[in-house]
């Protein structure tokens, strides 16, 4: 089977001391870049999409593309629901064939977060679907959701254990100082908090908001228990800037098969770097 859940991927990463990158895609071209690069580097990767991406491209279309590309390259792939919030939406996509879910109820009070997440876990585990949830809240913008700095809060290590045990999740997304989007200056990550969380929780840990982080910071988080690294904005920026540059230099260009090549190449460089930073080359 080529379309897999993330559970085994992340458990392997936890045992092996590396991380699996989750790349947010938006269309055929961005998916091609991720899958082709991962296959060439024999690296495990997760194809992630926000609710907006699934609405834009279509759930059935994305599933068909992932399945076809996984078979074409003989490369197992996971397609993952990133930052999904609605149970009915998640259930519909799981029944369509998605096998990895992030239920994001991090904006809710602790007890309500547990209740919402457990409902999703109980449903998804019936279908052998892995579930990620977040404790703490990152700043920045993801899809149409904007979290202001005043609403940001970090993961409490002791609460993290209670949360994991009460919900039955397969992986835990933590808030240690990253944010969605690109950084104006290097963020100060709370490594001691991450180390403490690792001591309280034995699940694979997930880092959101990794676009623009230094190689050193990414690799330090992996040493302290991060097994999944999420990258979105950095991919979009590379793709769109290269496309703008090409069309500025070639205003006569009309064939997308030509003018999208530079955008794909720029994005491929980012994907290759993230795979190297995660230490997962040759691990598929």
From Swiss-Prot:
PANTHER family on file: D-TAGATOSE-1,6-BISPHOSPHATE ALDOLASE (PTHR30304), D-TAGATOSE-1,6-BISPHOSPHATE ALDOLASE SUBUNIT GATY-RELATED (PTHR30304:SF0)
E.C. number: 4.1.2.40
Gene name tied to this protein: gatY
Gene Ontology CC terms: cytosol
GO aspect biological process, one term: D-tagatose 6-phosphate catabolic process
UniProt pathway annotation: Carbohydrate metabolism; D-tagatose 6-phosphate degradation; D-glyceraldehyde 3-phosphate and glycerone phosphate from D-tagatose 6-phosphate: step 2/2
Binding site for dihydroxyacetone phosphate: 181, 209-211, 230-233
Residues at the active site: 82 (proton donor)
Residues that coordinate or bind Zn(2+): 83, 180, 208
Catalyzed reactions per annotation: D-tagatofuranose 1,6-bisphosphate = D-glyceraldehyde 3-phosphate + dihydroxyacetone phosphate
Protein name according to UniProt: D-tagatose-1,6-bisphosphate aldolase subunit GatY
One Gene Ontology molecular-function label: tagatose-bisphosphate aldolase activity
A Pfam entry, by short name: F_bP_aldolase
Main function: Catalytic subunit of the tagatose-1,6-bisphosphate aldolase GatYZ, which catalyzes the reversible aldol condensation of dihydroxyacetone phosphate (DHAP or glycerone-phosphate) with glyceraldehyde 3-phosphate (G3P) to produce tagatose 1,6-bisphosphate (TBP). Requires GatZ subunit for full activity and stability. Is involved in the catabolism of galactitol.
UniProt record similarity statement: Belongs to the class II fructose-bisphosphate aldolase family. TagBP aldolase GatY subfamily.
Cofactor note: Binds 1 zinc ion per subunit.
Cofactor field: Zn(2+)
Subunit and interaction comment: Forms a complex with GatZ.
UniProt keyword terms in alphabetical order: Galactitol metabolism, Lyase, Metal-binding, Zinc
InterPro entries: Aldolase_TIM, Class_II_FBP_aldolase, FBA_II, TagBP_ald_KbaY/GatY, TagBP_aldolase_GatY
